[in-house]
């Protein structure tokens, strides 16, 4: 039983690390979206925009594929900052598993556009 408890603690610690990396990477992604739009479209268009509007602009400019998915990441980021309970942590963890592919896709689109 003690071994199982240690494994559970290690798994929870691993998930917490994944969530922390998600939070950091999510922040970088939206900031790069904003910077790309400021540089390539207009700096005025992104002044004071909400994340919803930023993701809409990013989708319109083909930086991201799925607007709704990015709104889900935004929700997960917000909830991970303000709440900690195991059910919400598990939900955020599951969302981060989808986020990895979306973040990689976004990076690829940025790289193609910046050559």
Task: Please give the residue ranges for each predicted region.
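Solvent-exposed interaction patches of small proteins and small membrane subunits
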Residues: 1-115
């Amino acid at each position: 039983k003690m071994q199982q408890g240690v494994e559970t603690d290690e798994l929870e610690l691993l998930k917490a690390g994944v969530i922390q990396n998600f939070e950091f990477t999510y922040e970088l992604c939206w900031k790069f979206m904003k910077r790309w739009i400021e540089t390539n479209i207009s700096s005025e268009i992104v002044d004071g925009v909400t994340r919803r509007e930023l993701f809409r602009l990013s989708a319109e400019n083909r930086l991201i594929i799925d607007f709704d998915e990015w709104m889900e990441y935004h929700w997960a980021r917000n909830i991970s900052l303000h709440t900690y309970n195991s059910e919400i942590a598990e939900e955020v963890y599951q969302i981060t598993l989808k986020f990895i592919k979306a973040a990689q896709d976004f990076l690829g689109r940025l790289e193609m556009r910046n050559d």
